[in-house]
Amino acid sequence: MKLYRSLDRYKQRSVDTLMESMIENDMLAFREQCVAAFTRLGHDELPVSAGTGMPLTDTFDREYVFLRNSRSVCRADTIITVTGDSMLPTFRDGDELLVEYTPEIEVGEIGIFVVAGEGFVKEYQPDGLHSHNPKYKTIRPVQDDNFRCVGRVLDVITEDMLATPRELAVLNEIYSSKRDN
């Protein structure tokens, strides 16, 4: 600071300009890092039950979440929230799941299913859809149930996957400027 004060005002202005440029470059680099490090995923307000079932409707709200890139985040198509306790201890009520849309999953995988118009998160087995909580029975869909697989559960969202407030502010600014153009 002492050296800065010893400069005449023109040299101080030059130092100020250089510092502003350096700060701007740091911010641009941080923005680029955020864009490269995060994926924007839609969070479907589509209830899926880890319990006795949740009626599905054709309309639902969609909000977006920025998640740190990982194999499961990059494969995911959406985020869906668990309702109920039938998948304890694997999933808890309120857990947010990364889901990849697919009409089929392998035996032993956990998926999102529609049975008779209700959404479920269950483990797929040849004899039906299994809960991990032993107090729930296996769901054995019949042809009249209009049974279908919506997607494969890839992972549960954890705190460390989420953007920090600073990262989120930058990502929201970037996204809003893209949307406005």
Question: What does each model-identified segment do?
Answer:
Residues A29-Q33, A37-F38, L46-A50, P55-Y64, ...:
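Acidic/glycine-rich C-terminal interaction modules and beta/coil loop segments
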Residues M1-E45:
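Charged, helix-prone or intrinsically disordered regulatory segments positioned adjacent to compact structured domains
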